[in-house]
A protein has these predicted regions:
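Nucleotide-activated sugar donor-binding and catalytic core shared by glycosyltransferases
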Residues: 2-444
C-alpha cells in the first residue's frame, strides 16, 4: 500500500459502510448462534450484555488487551504479568469462552484485587464499542497475534485510542488472498497506531500494508508459562510405564488429516512388529473436542490396541492401570488444556493443520519443551518460527508419506533436546522488547 494515500481511502469508506450494514442485518443471527451454543455451554449467553459493550463505569483508565481465545491469551500471559506491575488496571477481552476462562484461571488474584477484568469483546459495530470504551476508557489497546476487526480499528482511531498489533504475524497466504479482494478487513490496518511483530519478514509485511510504526519483538509464545504439573505427570508415566519406548505425539490433527495420519501409524506399527522391534507409542490429539468420538471410532476400526486418556488416567493425570498403558499402540488425547502433558510425553511432535492446506498449528509449545517438530507442507500461519526452526534443524516440513519413510529408517528424535533449547533461547526476550516498543510508540 502507498503510505502517501489518504486514510481511509474511498475504497475503505465504502467497505466500512457495507460492513456496518452487514452487522445490522446479521446481528439477530449472531445472537441466535450464541443461544444455540449456550444449550451446551451456558457461558455463551451468561454474559451476553458484554457483547453489546455493557459494563459498569470504571474509575480509572485501563490497558486493553484483546486475546481472542486460549492460545492468544496464553501467549499474552507474560506480558500481562509485566503490565500488572504498574498502577494501571487491565481489561482482557476474548471472543471465545476458552480465552475468558483461561484469563480468569491465570489471573484469579488480580481479578479479585480489582486490577484485572476479563470479559467478552463487544460485537464489532460502533454502538457496542463506544459503550465499552466509555466504561473502561482504554489508555491503549493491544490486539494479540493478528486481528483485523474493522470496527475495532476504526472506532479506536475515532476515539484517539492508540491501538497496536502485538506478537503480530501476517502470512503470505493471507496477504495474497486479501490483495485479490476489493474489500478486505486488512485494508483497515493503516488505522493502527503501530505493530509489534515476530520477525523482520513480518515487519516488511506490515509496512507494505501501510502500518507506519513497526517493531520486531520476537515470539511471545516462547515465554508462556509451562504447567509444571503436566510435565511432572508425563515424566512419571515415562519412567513407570514406558521406560525407553519411543513416543510420538500427533497434535492438533484437523478434519481431513485423520485417514493419512492413522495410515502412518498403522504402517509404522506393522513394520516394527515385523522387524521384532519395540513399537512406538503414538499419542493422537485431535484439534477439536467435538471430533473425539469420531476419531475413537476410526481408531477402533483399525488393528490397534488403544485407550483414551479419560479412561486410563485420573483427573490429575495419574495412571489408573500402568499395565494397560504399557501395551498401547495409541493413546487418544480426548481432553482439553493438557497439550503440554501430551507433548511432554513424546520424543517427536507431529503438528497438524499443514497436511490439508489449512495452515499448520502452533509449534511453539513443543519447541519450548525441547521436542523436535514435524509439520505438513503448508506452513502459513506459523511462518515464524517455522522457517527459522527448519533452518536451525529442529523442525522438518514433510508430507505424511515422507514422515512415514523417515520413521521407518531413522530414530524419531532427529535432533537433541539441547539443540531445540538453544533455538528457543536464541528467540527469547519478547516481553521485554514488547514493553520497550510500547513505551517508544506512546512516547516517541
Amino acid at each position: 500500500m502507498d503510505n502517501t494515500t489518504p486514510f481511509p481511502s474511498l475504497n475503505v469508506r465504502i467497505m466500512l459502510l457495507l460492513y456496518r450494514s452487514i452487522w445490522l442485518v446479521c446481528l439477530p443471527l449472531v445472537i441466535a448462534y450464541l443461544f444455540l451454543r449456550g444449550w451446551r455451554d451456558p457461558i455463551y449467553v451468561k454474559y451476553l450484555g458484554e457483547r453489546f459493550g455493557i459494563h459498569k463505569q470504571r474509575m480509572k483508565p485501563h490497558i486493553w488487551i484483546h486475546a481472542v481465545s486460549l492460545g492468544e491469551l496464553r501467549s499474552a500471559a507474560p506480558l500481562i504479568e509485566e503490565l500488572l506491575k504498574s498502577d494501571t488496571p487491565i481489561v482482557t477481552t476474548h471472543f471465545t469462552p476458552a480465552g475468558r476462562r483461561e484469563s480468569e484461571r491465570l489471573f484469579t488474584t488480580a481479578i479479585s484485587d480489582g486490577r484485572l477484568t476479563a470479559c467478552y469483546i463487544p460485537f464489532d459495530y460502533g454502538a457496542a464499542l463506544r459503550r465499552f470504551f466509555k466504561a473502561f476508557r482504554p489508555k491503549y489497546g493491544l490486539l494479540m497475534e493478528f486481528e483485523a476487526w474493522p470496527g475495532i480499528i476504526m472506532n479506536s482511531r475515532k476515539k484517539q485510542i492508540p491501538l497496536f498489533i502485538c506478537n503480530g504475524a501476517y502470512s503470505n497466504h493471507s496477504i495474497q488472498r486479501d490483495q485479490k479482494r476489493y474489500f478486505s478487513p486488512a485494508k483497515t490496518l493503516p488505522g493502527l497506531s503501530g505493530a509489534m511483530v515476530k520477525s523482520e519478514f513480518q515487519a516488511d509485511q506490515f509496512r507494505q500494508l501501510g502500518v507506519d510504526k513497526v517493531a520486531v519483538t520476537g515470539e511471545m509464545r516462547f515465554e508462556q508459562r509451562i504447567p509444571t504439573p503436566q510435565v511432572a505427570a508425563a515424566t512419571a508415566i515415562r519412567k513407570e510405564a514406558l521406560n525407553s519406548r519411543t513416543v510420538i505425539t500427533l497434535s492438533s490433527i484437523v478434519f481431513g488429516e485423520d485417514t493419512d495420519a492413522l495410515q502412518l501409524i498403522e504402517t509404522v506399527q506393522t513394520h516394527f512388529t515385523q522387524q521384532g522391534l519395540a513399537k512406538p507409542l503414538f499419542i493422537y490429539v485431535p484439534r477439536a473436542p467435538e471430533r473425539f468420538g469420531l476419531i475413537s471410532d476410526m481408531i477402533a476400526a483399525k488393528p490397534f490396541i488403544y485407550g483414551m486418556r479419560s479412561n486410563l488416567l485420573t483427573e490429575d493425570l495419574k495412571m489408573i492401570c500402568p499395565e494397560k498403558i504399557k501395551d498401547l499402540d495409541i493413546l487418544l488425547g480426548n481432553s482439553l488444556g493438557e497439550m503440554y502433558f501430551y507433548l511432554s510425553l513424546c520424543d517427536l511432535a507431529i503438528i497438524g493443520g499443514g497436511f490439508c492446506k489449512k495452515g499448520s498449528h502452533n509449534i511453539s509449545e513443543a519447541l519450548c519443551l525441547g521436542k523436535p517438530v514435524m509439520i505438513g507442507p503448508t506452513d502459513y500461519g506459523i511462518e515464524f518460527p517455522a522457517r527459522e526452526a527448519i533452518e536451525y534443524g529442529v523442525c522438518k516440513k514433510l508430507d505424511f508419506e515422507q514422515i512415514t519413510q523417515f520413521l521407518l529408517n531413522n530414530p524419531a528424535q532427529f535432533c537433541a533436546s539441547d539443540q531445540v533449547d538453544a533455538f528457543v533461547a536464541s528467540h527469547s526476550g519478547s516481553t521485554d522488547k514488547t514493553m520497550a516498543a510500547i513505551k517508544l510508540f506512546l512516547d516517541p
